[in-house]
UniProtKB/Swiss-Prot annotation:
One CC-aspect GO term: nucleus
TM regions (residue ranges): none
PANTHER family (alphabetical): RING1 AND YY1-BINDING PROTEIN, RYBP AND YAF2-RELATED
UniProt gene name: rybpa
Record's compositionally biased regions (Low complexity): 160-192, 337-361
Lineage: Eukaryota, Metazoa, Chordata, Craniata, Vertebrata
Pfam family of the protein (one): YAF2_RYBP
One GO MF term attached to the UniProt entry: transcription coregulator activity
Protein name per its UniProtKB record: RING1 and YY1-binding protein A
Intracellular or extracellular location(s): Nucleus; Cytoplasm
Amino acid sequence: MGDKKSPSRPKRQAKPSADNGFWDCSVCTFKNSAEAFKCSICDVRKGTSTRKPRINSQLVAQQVAQQYAAPPPAKKERRERTDRDLPDDDHFDMDNSDSDRLSSLHPDSDHPERLGLEGGQLDRGHSLKERRQERVLDKPQALDTDRRPERAGLTPDLLQQQQPQPQQHPQQPQQPQQHSQQQPQQHPPQQHNRIDREHTDRAMLEKLQPLREHMEKDHPHTAGSGMQPAERMGAEREELKKGKIERAMMEKHKERHKSLTPSKKPTPKKMKPKLIQKSPAGESNGMKPGKSVTKNNKSVISRPKLKNVDRSSAQQLAITVGNVTVIITDFKEKTRSSSTSSSTVTSSAGSEQQHLSSSSESTDKGSSRASTPRRDHSSGHNETL
């Protein structure tokens, strides 16, 4: 431990002393013998330099005198202090230091006391073990004595609830009497339990009989007398599974038919605006389909107003593509001048804009079915006015 040479600085060499190898402690300045590798007072190793302020030599002399008379109490405190201050390399077997030092100084004083202590401890250990064994042996006896008065003091009500226990404590004379009391008292509740079970079994069988008859009617091929109940249950389960699969297939077919034939009929509200009316009512009614188209388109494009359009020759076509219904209104050119020309101009312009926007939308979807009506129809409508 202490013989290692640190690479940073060379180890100090002790000064050669002319006193036959006696060396002074660097902490407490006590002159130690040549054989001692530690200071006999402060346990500092030989050759260490702790750079502490040295204690007065008078105090050291007093401590040495006290040490030979009686071991001083201050020695341990001083040793703890030096242990804290010393580096790790300088600690050497501190646990064995007391024994080494005391054996060197007082070879005969400490050992007999220790031997006496060890002998006393051994005797104590043996006595403790014996006491523990005695306690362990006494415990089951105490338990037996505790159990017996309780068993004697049992009431007949408790005895009815308990099961017969012939194995426990056969030595007692009271036990067979108690068992003889218990047995006649316990048989009636067992009989009652059996009767109750039989009643419940009968009730369950009565409930299950109509169900079984119903199942036999539904499944006559499984109700044969040769079939075991387990086989019947398996066959019924298979039939239930088949019925579920058939229902699922039917529902799928129905859904497919619905998806293949979507309803292309327009809604009656949008389909049936009144086509032919007098001029003031026609204007108000003609704007309604236009409003619905603007709601669907959500974008009104500003276009120049067309004044040469006849409002009364309105023809509407409804086209449904999926969920969207587009109403297209067709107008013919104006042939006669009416007194309500200004009002018809404004309404016809709005409806013409809607017609253009809706037709563009339908052509984008590739499903425009609007066909321009013939002149014959328009002339016929004009005649009805």
